[in-house]
Regions:
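Cytosolic C-terminal regulatory domains/tails of membrane transporters and channels
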Residues: 8-193
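Alpha-helical membrane-embedded segments
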Residues: 1-6
Length: 193
């Protein structure tokens, strides 16, 4: 267990460094002349402090951003079910007209954090913040980190190998969040361990 926790701490620290601040990213997007393409893109991400790697990669590699962007965080609660009125909150991240929002889904331990279902159930709230965006046909973008064990670092070699093996066996985020395979794009990056 200590190998898993230590490895996750290292990976999380490296990811946060690569991701950078979400507020800075939104400011950069707002002040730049990025080409905006039609449609809605949803980026599952654990928090609203840092920018999803898939969002950064999409902008850096393709030079475009969808007209409507939803950064979606699922937060587990210590109750069996969360009431519908308390499940979703939407934040425009500082600019009401840039088409970028952060959605927080709170769910209980008997609930499944199904993102398409949550968007369908709370679509009016999200669509209103996005200026009337169509949420029935969205694209989902996942960040996938490939771990690269290095000779240097704060973990012994055998612990790195064990952590990499455990990470490969971790749950598939697309299945966990109920994302449709035909509308999900996985964008990868490499993280040193």
């Amino acid at each position: 267990m200590s190998t898993w926790h230590r490895g996750r701490d290292i990976v999380t620290a490296n990811r946060v460094e690569k991701e950078g601040s979400l507020a800075d990213f939104v400011e950069q997007v707002h002040s730049s002349k990025l080409v905006r393409v039609p449609g809605t893109a949803v980026f599952p991400h654990p928090n609203k402090e840092s920018a999803p790697l898939a969002l950064r990669a999409n902008v850096e590699h393709n030079g475009v951003l969808h007209q409507h962007v939803v950064i979606f965080s699922a937060v587990p609660k210590t109750v069996p079910h969360v009431a519908k009125d308390d499940q979703v909150s939407v934040d425009n991240l500082g600019y009401a007209d840039d088409g970028i929002v952060h959605v927080t889904l709170r769910y209980g331990f008997f609930d499944r954090p199904n993102i398409p279902y949550a968007l369908a159930r709370h679509g009016d709230e999200v669509s209103a913040e996005l200026g009337g965006a169509e949420l029935s046909d969205v694209s989902y973008f996942l960040s996938r980190a490939t771990l690269r064990p290095r000779r240097t670092g704060s973990m012994r070699r055998w612990r790195k190998a064990l952590f990499v093996a455990m990470a490969r066996n971790a749950a598939n985020p697309a299945a966990y969040f109920g994302l449709p395979a035909d509308r999900t794009v996985v964008m990868g990056t490499q993280i040193d361990l």
